[in-house]
Amino acid sequence: MVSVDQVKKAREGKKRRFTQTFELIFNLKNVDLRKYRLSTYIVLPRGRGKKMPILAIVGPENKELAEKYFDIVLTREDLKQLDKRTAKKLAKRHYHVVAQADLMPELGKSLLGRFLGIRGKMPNPKAGQILPPNLNEKMLEALREKLNNTVRVNVKKHVTFGVPIGTEDMEDEAIAENADTVINEIISQLPQGKQNIDSVYLKLTMGPAVRVL
């Protein structure tokens, strides 16, 4: 669906002093977002091209283990002590959030939970973000790798939205494969499939938009 030539064309913009992200821009049509909400998680087969920040909420018995795999680890007591400014900052900074199942009620009632909810980042079982109390290294290593390659799609109000699919450091073939995976998954989630898509563009953060669908 997305060709290597289209990826090359999207690279033609001026070089920047930072590593740009490849993004697909979707424009939907004939979808009433008041009745239908597009919410899904997509694992990119060729990865994101960079490490994504992940926040974990676990019991004190699992904190040391979790710190090996996640960027910030909070316990029940840490949740209680968060002020509004810190909670808001944590919710904004982290792309994924995981939490032990037995701590979900407390997370939901906390300041952090409120800001995560606003951003659509509350731990979701569909993405494997709800943890059992008996954690182990093999489990967390696999989860870290999976989440690092997982993008979140949460469309509530606007028929135009973007999905990150990699960085400019990645090979053209990898970007094309990731793009196909995301487009096919979005189509499968829409009420009328491809008929609900008006257009799809591929672009770098500061680059030209190339129509791919």
Curated annotation (Swiss-Prot):
Subunit structure: Part of the 50S ribosomal subunit.
Record bears the keyword RNA-binding: yes
Record-given protein name: Large ribosomal subunit protein uL1
Its job: Binds directly to 23S rRNA. Probably involved in E site tRNA release.
GO cellular component: large ribosomal subunit
GO molecular function: rRNA binding; structural constituent of ribosome; tRNA binding
This protein's encoding gene: rpl1
Similarity remark: Belongs to the universal ribosomal protein uL1 family.
Transmembrane segments: none
Organism this protein belongs to: Nanoarchaeum equitans (strain Kin4-M)
Upper taxonomic lineage: Archaea, Nanobdellota, Candidatus Nanoarchaeia, Nanoarchaeales, Nanoarchaeaceae
InterPro entries: Ribosomal_uL1, Ribosomal_uL1-like, Ribosomal_uL1/biogenesis, Ribosomal_uL1_3-a/b-sand, Ribosomal_uL1_arc
One GO BP: regulation of translation
UniProt keyword list: Repressor, Ribonucleoprotein, Ribosomal protein, RNA-binding, rRNA-binding, Translation regulation, tRNA-binding
